[in-house]
């Protein structure tokens, strides 16, 4: 379950707080197409998997103190990941 994955991820509180602040201005269409070359028409699980993979790569770079690590991109990915997880959770709770 990919939504469980998000809840088990341990990241610095400052990154999570910044990502949560980003939820206020998160624009799904713009974010997915501009930053991640993802389509809103893709299955939500595909989008979530892509975001999880990208966040994992960024976190690895952060931990290795890689010179090309981009904290702003990391926050953007975390924001999208949180927003998309909430969207899936909301869809799963809607009656059929």
Where do the model's predicted regions map?
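Long, non-catalytic architectural segments outside compact domain cores
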Residues: 1-46, 96
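Generic secondary-structure transition motif, activating predominantly at the C-termini of alpha-helices
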Residues: 23, 27, 55-62
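Short amphipathic alpha-helical heptad-repeat segments
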Residues: 43-56
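Acidic-enriched, low-complexity/disordered segments with a strong bias for Aspartate over Glutamate
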Residues: 1, 53, 89-91
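Short, compact, well-ordered microdomains
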Residues: 57-96
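Short alpha-helical segments used as structural interaction elements across diverse proteins
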Residues: 8, 51-52, 71
